[in-house]
Amino acid sequence: MMVFGIQSNWKHHAYGMVFLLLALIRPVPGLAEDINVLMSTEDFLAHAFDGQYQSNIVWITPSFRRQLEQAMNSSFRGARVRYWRNGNRSAWVLERIGKERPITAGFVVENNQILLSRLLTYRESRGGEIQYPGFIAQFKGASLDKVNRLNRHIDGITGATLSVDAIKRMATASLLMAKESATPQQVSTQ
């Protein structure tokens, strides 16, 4: 078929239009939220405590920030962190970026050891094995050694190295903050 002196293959143009339309309507990775909420903060706290707990704040002073960052081998943002306490038991809900998206995990610390750990929300598109209870259960009983590192080896997950590192950093931070929150704070009245 000749159109304006140019030979046109209508089938070629039709296929091109179909591919263009499919490209425009397909979901774009990263725009849709891949959020897997495994446990709410409220459910985690109910599991951590038998109903009674108080909300508290640990202040991140410059010297404590340096200690956190050195132990985590990573920066730490924020001036304060909310936590929950009943007696010697404290619960920490922390969030760190894995490879691309935030991961939310909860840690219960008692007597300078992790008593309970739970992955609360996982937003990454890869490394889904991190959501299995067997991975996060490795942190139970973990404490800090003399240089404020986890005292045990945590098995990684192929393809989820950054997510595993994020959870290890959160576990370390929860132990350090639990120790800091148990220390009486000097309050300046000036």
Positions of PLM-derived features:
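N-terminal secretory signal peptides that target proteins for export/translocation
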Residues: 1-11
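Sec-dependent N-terminal signal peptides
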Residues: 11-20
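Carboxylate-rich, polar loop motifs that coordinate divalent cations or form catalytic acidic clusters
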Residues: 24
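Flexible, solvent-exposed loop/hinge segments and secondary-structure transition points
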Residues: 31-155, 161, 165, 169-190
